[in-house]
Amino acid sequence: MTIKSDRWIQVMAREYGMIEPFVAEQVRGGIISYGLSSYGYDMRVADEFKVFTNVFNTLVDPKHFDPRSFVDIRGDYCDIPPNSFALARSVEYFRIPRNVLCIVLGKSTIARCGIIVNVTPLEPEWCGYVTIEISNTTPLPARIYANEGIAQVLFLESDEPPLVSYADKAGKYQNQTGVVPPRL
C-alpha cells in the first residue's frame, strides 16, 4: 500500500468526485484548519450533532442502543458535556475508489484539548458523509466548532483491488446522508 499525495487527491477529487465539496488548499487563520494537505485531506465537521445523554439508559449496549440516548443539536458549535460524547458528520461527501482504504485521525489541536476523534476506516467503494465520534475526556464541557477542521483523512492505495468491496457487500453505512447512530 502507498500513501497518496496532494497531487493524487486533487485529481481524484476533481475527476472522480472523491471529495465534495473539495477545498484545494489549507484554509487556516483563526480557525481549526481544513482542506488539502501534503498527504491527506483535513475534513470539516458539519453543523449537525447528536449529543449523548443518560436520561433513558442505565447501560450502553451496542446491540440494543436506544436512539433516545441522543439529543439533536444544530448550530455553529456544539458543547459536549464532561466525560461524554457526540456524533457528528463531515461537511464533505466521500466516494472511496475500489483500490483505496482511508484512515482517519483526529486533528492535534483538538486532541491537545482532551477531545478525542474516532472514525473507523473508510473502506473501498464506501460512499457517504462520514459519521464522526467525538469524546470529551475532560471534566469540563468541550466545544466543537461547525464548518472547521476535525480530522485528517489519509488515502492508502493498494497494488490490487479487494475481492469484495464495501459496496459489494451492501455495507450498512453505505450512502449515509446524516449523522447515523449504531446499526446492527
From Swiss-Prot:
Reaction catalysed by this enzyme: dCTP + H2O + H(+) = dUTP + NH4(+)
Pathway: Pyrimidine metabolism; dUMP biosynthesis; dUMP from dCTP (dUTP route): step 1/2
One Pfam family cited in the UniProt record for this chain: DCD
GO BP of this protein: dUMP biosynthetic process; dUTP biosynthetic process; nucleobase-containing small molecule interconversion
Keywords from the named record: Hydrolase, Nucleotide metabolism, Nucleotide-binding
Residues that, per the record, bind dCTP: 107-112, 152, 166, 176
Enzyme active site: 133 (proton donor/acceptor)
Enzyme Commission code: 3.5.4.13
GO molecular function: dCTP deaminase activity; nucleotide binding
Keyword Iron-sulfur: no
Family classification: Belongs to the dCTP deaminase family.
Oligomer and partners: Homotrimer.
Function according to Swiss-Prot or TrEMBL: Catalyzes the deamination of dCTP to dUTP.
Protein name: dCTP deaminase
The species this protein was found in: Roseiflexus castenholzii (strain DSM 13941 / HLO8)
